[in-house]
């Protein structure tokens, strides 16, 4: 499968199944397109030869021109790449998908909902102000301890285990967070495990003690900020209706500075009111000094005033291109920023099974409520039909777990002809469920956004050769 596009002056050809990315000249670009359309080799050669003058007219003055022998030479190079498995490669992944129901159920990560309550009242919150459409509550140390034991017991021989302190607002239960980290450290050697903790916070509860603890114990922190003050404060208000920007920004800056500017993400949400989200990213970078950035489209039902419209998406796609070009400029000038969704590894990358199955929700990754219930991920919490079991009895809804085992790109017919399927791995099961009522469905707007991100990320990789 081949995907071709032009962006920022680059002719980019992606060979889906090999993962090879080629930056080519105009004649080669057209030759690949014609061959991909099923045109015979000789017809392609004649077509290229008949258009040499047109190709030459596109070449800037002073640069080498095409000659009569170039069409044949280009076709030979394409044939060499094809023989090497770097163009028109075969799908080696689909046969692996049939093994998924038989795969082991090693649990690698937990999302610990230490607080089903929050000190902000964000109107766009998918978690209903941290309560997940249920009652408020804080996780006890005993429940959290059992969750960590459950993770160890079900992690097999895996050494590194991931735990995210989540909510609600986890710092509303900071003492328990501290106790759980201390407990985890106390059992690492005995079980040959290493816990890697992440803290996701709105920043209200950050203190000097929190900063010292997080920078010592958490290998990553996720800091929620939507960007410009007026954008952030539209939705991210406290319980009295006051915007949070002025309170949280100095705390975030202090934490990041103490952290050495590493291993964190500023995580924002853009909505119908700010589809021009690059202005928010650039505000965080240029005015506030943050360099590790992420920005997500809002999760909202159609008709919600915050929900993105089809018209918004066109603006959003333009914004992704603006961001990619600006990141190249910053890299050239020696002041780079990182955007989470443009981080792509073309030399190593995930294993075969990861490329097919994605995040592992419901199998390798689960969310734990304050009361110890298990769900496939945080976006399913509160939906009783998606309860997997609990941390005392383990996974008891085996049929549901088996459904999530089969969550892979080949289980979704709509993904069959998508060039980006081995980058998204079939996409988010929760987004699919909320959009279609089926975890094997497809969230089409999300697909469009994802494909644009990948195109921009690959273009940045192409540009890096010229830096």
Describe the predicted segments one by one.
Residues 1-35:
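Acidic, low-complexity/disordered tracts enriched in E/D and polar residues
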Residues 39-64:
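Short acidic, hydrophobic short linear motifs in intrinsically disordered regions
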Residues 66-69, 73-212, 217:
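Conserved alpha-helical substructure of the radical SAM core
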Residues 144, 148-164, 173-298:
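Radical SAM/AdoMet-radical enzyme domain recognition
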Residues 148-166, 404, 442-467:
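Short Fe-S-cluster ligation motifs
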């Amino acid at each position: 499968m081949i995907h071709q596009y032009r962006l920022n002056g680059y002719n980019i050809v992606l060979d889906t199944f090999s993962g090879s990315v080629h930056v080519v000249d105009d004649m080669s670009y057209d030759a690949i397109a014609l061959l991909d359309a099923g045109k015979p080799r000789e017809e392609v050669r004649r077509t290229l030869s008949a258009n040499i003058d047109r190709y030459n007219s596109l070449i800037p003055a002073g640069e080498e021109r095409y000659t009569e022998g170039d069409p044949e030479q280009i076709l030979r190079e394409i044939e060499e790449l094809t023989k090497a498995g770097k163009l028109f490669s075969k799908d080696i992944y689909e046969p692996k998908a049939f093994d998924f129901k038989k795969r082991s159920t090693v649990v690698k990560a937990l999302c610990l909902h230490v607080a089903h309550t929050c000190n902000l009242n964000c109107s766009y919150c998918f978690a209903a102000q941290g309560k997940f459409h249920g009652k408020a509550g804080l996780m006890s140390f005993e429940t959290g301890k059992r969750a960590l034991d459950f993770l160890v017991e079900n992690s097999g021989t895996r050494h590194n285990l991931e735990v995210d302190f989540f909510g609600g607002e986890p710092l509303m239960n900071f003492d328990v967070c501290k106790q759980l980290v201390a407990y985890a450290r106390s059992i690492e050697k005995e079980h040959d495990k290493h816990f890697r903790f992440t803290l996701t916070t709105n920043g209200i509860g950050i203190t000097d003690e929190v900063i010292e603890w997080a920078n010592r114990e958490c290998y990553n922190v996720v800091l929620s900020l939507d960007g410009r003050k007026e954008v952030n404060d539209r939705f991210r208000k406290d319980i009295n209706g006051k915007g949070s920007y002025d309170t949280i920004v100095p705390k975030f800056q202090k934490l990041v500075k103490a952290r050495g500017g590493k291993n964190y993400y500023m995580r924002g949400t853009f909505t119908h009111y700010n589809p021009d989200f690059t202005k928010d990213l650039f505000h965080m970078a240029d005015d506030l000094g943050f360099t590790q950035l992420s920005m997500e489209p809002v999760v909202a039902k159609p008709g919600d005033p915050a929900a993105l419209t089809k018209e918004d998406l066109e603006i959003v796609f333009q914004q992704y291109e603006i961001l990619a070009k600006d990141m190249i400029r910053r890299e050239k000038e020696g002041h780079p920023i990182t955007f989470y969704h443009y981080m792509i590894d073309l030399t190593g990358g995930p294993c075969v099974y990861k490329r097919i199955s994605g995040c592992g929700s419901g199998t390798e990754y689960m969310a734990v409520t304050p009361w110890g219930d298990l769900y496939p991920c945080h976006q399913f919490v509160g939906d009783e039909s998606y309860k997997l079991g609990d941390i005392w009895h383990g996974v008891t809804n085996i049929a549901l777990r088996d459904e999530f085992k089969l969550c892979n790109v080949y289980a979704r017919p709509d993904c069959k002809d998508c060039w980006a399927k081995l980058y998204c791995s079939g996409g988010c099961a929760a987004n699919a469920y909320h959009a279609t009522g089926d975890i094997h469905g497809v969230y089409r707007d999300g697909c469009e956004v994802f494909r644009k991100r990948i195109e921009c990320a690959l273009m940045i990789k192409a540009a890096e050769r010229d830096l």
